[in-house]
Amino acid sequence: MRDGVRHDEGVLMPAASAPAPASWESAVAWLVAQPGQTDLVRACYYDRPLAVAARRYHASEEWAAVRAMLPTSGGLALDLGAGNGIASYALARDSWRVVAVEPDPSAVVGAGAIRALAASEGLEITVLEGAGERIDVPSASVDLVFARQVLHHANDLRQLCREAARVLRPGGMFVAAREHVLSRASDLPAFLREHPLHRLYGGEHAYVLRDYRTALRDAGLVIVRELRPLESVVNFAPLTRASLRRELQSRLRRLPMGLAAARLLDHERIYDAARWLAARVDDRPGRLFTFVCKRPA
């Protein structure tokens, strides 16, 4: 769970002259140390102490929207590609029993950070170090697999989706949140050039929508909901509904006759309809989608 923010969401980017750190941990350390990058660091939940960042994520509009999609009964949740553990924290706070799977052992951005966070906050989070393509969890044992910004990092997208499906109980849910999508494969170089964190370490990727759908369906999962870029705060965070509205209104006011159109967005139904329409014409390379899937019962 590395790339916490899009380059066009009003957050500062690292300078093009940034060095090439040897690890993701050192890349994040470099970013945190840069003057003027506070907004980006907070948007990625890399600010310290980690417990404060995790609490902010749990209280965010993004997590509230995720929570609304999840089963209400709780159960066993697997946080796939858990990063520094903010989603594991949120799940545990919401009374899920949590297994966090993270390949990076880092005490800053990986498994070590999750263990320290769980200990400091008194939460029971089981941490497994390993890749999502081979999860050390029994088949049909998990009620929920949650993966925030993970699928586009997979070494093998199809295998990762197969593993997520394997560990789910029949009727279980898989949520793949904030996945970078391309309209065409040839857009990938442009996306990587503009991504604010790819410059620091690499490791970013994106797929065309068909590739995600095929990988999920071939794994035996049913896609029950597909959230486009501006349809849900899950995708347009760190903006909130209110701040996105202000941004859209500001852009409209610059257009001829735009003042009246901007005022119309004060009406919730019109604002929601405008976001729905914009989500269907959005062609930005790397725009964010969320996939809500179930394993058939």
Task: Report the location of each language-model feature.
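Acceptor-substrate binding/catalytic loop of class I
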Residues: 195-211
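Class I SAM-dependent methyltransferase SAM/SAH-binding core
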Residues: 84-134
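A C-terminal cap/extension of S-adenosyl-L-methionine-dependent methyltransferases
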Residues: 127, 225, 230-297
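Conserved class I S-adenosyl-L-methionine
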Residues: 4-72, 74-83, 90, 173-198
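A short glycine-rich, Lys/Arg-flanked "PGG" loop and its adjoining helix->strand segment in the class I
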Residues: 158-170
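A conserved beta-strand element that flanks and buttresses the S-adenosyl-L-methionine
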Residues: 146
